[in-house]
Design a protein with these regions (language model features):
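Flexible "arm" and connector segments at domain edges
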Residues: 1-102
Length: 102
């Protein structure tokens, strides 16, 4: 499961819990937001260091992309095109190498 899927599930679960209650949902402060993102990135880097797998690398890349889109610094179409332009051949080359090496 990719980060995007997990985040979407957690947000929907939180929305469902507060839908019928009188609760106000507030954004975290900038410091708390960045602390959470940094913690998640460190966690994913630890996994990548242990597994050295493309799936772990994809999780980190998707997390960065999701943050950029969520903050409005880029749009999803730009992210998709950027990945296709810069990583398509690279990704395919190393994916095939990893599978063949097993």
């Amino acid at each position: 499961m990719l980060v995007r899927d997990k985040v979407g599930e957690e947000i929907q679960r939180a929305i469902d819990k507060v839908a019928d209650s009188d609760v106000e949902v507030q954004m975290l402060t900038n410091e708390e937001f960045f602390d959470a993102i940094i913690l998640k990135i460190r966690s994913e880097l630890d996994v990548l260091e242990q597994t050295k797998s493309l799936d772990s690398l994809a999780e980190i890349m998707e997390l960065v992309d999701w943050v950029q889109v969520a903050l409005g610094t880029t749009n999803i179409q730009d992210v998709i095109q950027n990945r296709a332009d810069k990583l398509g051949l690279y990704w395919k080359k190393y994916y095939i190498k990893e599978k063949a090496g097993k």
